[in-house]
């Protein structure tokens, strides 16, 4: 499979770097800070990223309406888990579609991932709604597949959880209107926020209780989970931008590379606005934003200015593997998890390699779809 990428932002000026053969090289980041590699620990981090899991169980083996037709089934998640667990058996591809990938590590064995980062929409309906507050079936389904464990039905490495609009936009039945999003936020916090009295399964270095944004480090690489998006205030969310500014000032002011994760991106679907002529949201609309607006993106970009952001990984759109550059950011979006999609990433002091991939079959095989590489000077 070679993967063919169609133009995503026809009305907006950006550097596409989207080659139909799936091979992309990079330009410098507008956010690069003055870099002194001796100032931070060595970097040799391999990790996976996946978004849009959309667990769909509502009771027993019953799925939410339309989930089976859309492919949001447990069988498809098991295929995805099998591919993730076998990724270290594969080499970084030397070619995709007969074209050299240009990866710095091409032909080398993929190392066991340090973790799997989730880019939102863990569940399809706010964790799996029930009228009486209780643990939702969809959240149970998610944790039974995407919490580190053994055997063929769970991923075999730590999972860094992230929330999207499907996790956070579902209102509960009065008087428990915030129950479901609180349940999802509690799940993230209990998995990642350490306290004096509690050690979570995947502890992180810096957790913001208000926004549920968090950060951690793999050697000299700084990573930040921004949930739906950095600065989100929808459905009562508290903006994490002040926390982000302080986190970057404390942990990345020395110019070390930074990776960001959130649900929304800069693709045409994420940037939809209301189109009054067509009475719908689309990429030609001039009205209010469907997902996140120009001012919200500008505020996030302002918080990142001056830092060495080497990549942002997102989800939200399900069908198209995307590697593109917008507003000075290198952006990466795999196909949705329930469709088998994920990204494999390797970052060292000297380079960053990314491949977008898709699970194939039930035995853990993988198709590599697109590749990206950039060297650090």
What are these regions (language model features)?
Residues 86-102, 106-112, 154-155, 210, ...:
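His/acidic metal-ligating clusters that form di-metal
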